[in-house]
């Protein structure tokens, strides 16, 4: 996965600039919240709250917000161990004001730790690890309906678990179990998720992830839900996404499609497919994902979150390789529904 840390550096400024963009009026499609029997979510940066068009689109089509970056450790915890609450609190207040669910991400992630932990002795490390999780989760207790407690624990290729600062100090299963235990103490009512990516795209990784879930549950770890980011590769075989969802459903846990997008970018140098052909692949894969989610028992459909509203809000559009033409989300820059929106809506209606 591309490192989103570098890409997010300019995101807040970009969001603020977009509020001044002019766009032709669009015919508004039926709001997804009016047809979906589950919460529809999106990601948010506080700069987007100043963009009236973004706010209107958000309040029309979504019922849940996930902070894109400003509730991660890299933002909250300084190198000296001080906590910063301005942006996370503002997102929580926005949700309260507008009647949206708040979903927190992420308490522990290999990619965005804090330099604060790197100089600690083992005992202090454990103490501060517990303190961080409890401090953040307790602050939003009663407001956050759920948390990505641990994000991206499985190795990139799916062969085993990822080595990171947390696993080196607390063990590969140990840091995960400890994080869930501390989060449960901090907020017993929140749904606690193990979240990862490429679970549909790479069957090996999906299988490793589900074995991890099974192992932790057998050990008594209080995992309350399964999160699949669903950054979909539009070229995966038909049926592969549905197969993963069938396997994941066997635990009976709530499942969160937590970061959906589907890039149209041609990765192969000599890819000769037309844009229309790529859109057909995209909508087919997104429709399959939505149908697989709809096939879950109602109690297991936690939420369906798209990682951004407009194409220009996407982290993929902040990538240096972006040509300004990728369309990975439900709406274009002007807030008009993309074909991907229709794929989601039609799959929901089909039940």
Enumerate the language-model features and the residues they cover.
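Acidic-and-aromatic substrate-binding clefts and catalytic sites of carbohydrate-active enzymes
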Residues: 43-54, 73-86, 154-156, 199-208, ...
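N-terminal substrate-binding region of glycoside hydrolase catalytic domains
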Residues: 34-89, 94, 101, 106-120
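Glycoside hydrolase catalytic-domain groove-lining segments
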Residues: 173-178, 185, 189-191, 206-211, ...
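N-terminal secretory signal peptides and thylakoid transit peptides that target proteins
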Residues: 1-19
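Aromatic-rich peripheral "rim/lid" segments of glycoside hydrolase catalytic domains that contact
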Residues: 148, 152-158, 162-169, 240-247, ...
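Substrate-binding cleft and catalytic face of glycoside hydrolase catalytic domains
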Residues: 66-70, 88-169, 173-191, 197-199, ...
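Conserved, mostly hydrophobic/aromatic
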Residues: 65, 95, 147, 226, ...
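C-terminal segment of N-terminal export signals and the immediately downstream linker at the start
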Residues: 19-43
């Amino acid at each position: 996965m591309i490192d989103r840390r570098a890409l997010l550096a300019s995101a807040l400024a970009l969001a603020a600039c977009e509020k001044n963009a002019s766009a032709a009026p669009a015919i508004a499609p039926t709001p997804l919240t009016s047809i979906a029997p589950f919460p529809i979510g999106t990601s948010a940066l506080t700069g987007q709250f100043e963009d009236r068009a973004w706010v209107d689109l958000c309040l029309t089509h979504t019922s849940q917000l996930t902070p894109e970056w400003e509730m991660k450790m890299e933002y909250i915890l300084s190198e000296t161990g001080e906590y910063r609450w301005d942006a996370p609190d503002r997102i929580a207040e926005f949700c309260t004001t507008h009647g949206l669910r708040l979903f927190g991400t992420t308490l522990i992630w290999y990619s965005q730790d804090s330099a604060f932990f790197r100089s600690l002795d083992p005992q202090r490390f454990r103490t501060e690890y517990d303190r961080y999780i409890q401090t953040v989760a307790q602050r939003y207790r009663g407001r956050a309906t759920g948390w990505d407690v641990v994000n991206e624990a499985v190795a990139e290729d799916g062969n085993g678990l990822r080595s990171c600062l947390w696993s080196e100090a607390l063990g590969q299963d140990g840091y995960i179990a400890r994080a869930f235990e501390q989060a449960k103490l901090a907020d017993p009512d929140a749904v606690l998720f193990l979240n990862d990516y490429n679970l549909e795209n790479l069957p090996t990784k999906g299988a490793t992830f589900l074995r991890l879930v099974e192992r932790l549950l057998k050990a008594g770890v209080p995992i309350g839900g399964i999160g699949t980011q669903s950054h979909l590769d539009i070229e995966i075989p038909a049926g592969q996404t549905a197969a993963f969802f069938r396997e994941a459903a066997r635990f009976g846990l709530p499942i969160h499609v937590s970061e959906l997008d589907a890039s149209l970018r041609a990765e192969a140098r000599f890819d000769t497919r037309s844009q229309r052909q790529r859109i057909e692949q995209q909508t087919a894969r997104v429709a399959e994902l939505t149908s697989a989610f709809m096939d879950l028992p109602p109690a297991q459909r936690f939420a369906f979150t798209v990682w951004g509203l407009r194409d220009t809000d996407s982290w993929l559009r902040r990538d240096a390789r972006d040509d300004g033409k990728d369309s990975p989300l439900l709406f274009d820059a002007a807030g008009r529904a993309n074909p991907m929106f229709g794929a989601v809506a039609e799959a929901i209606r089909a039940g």
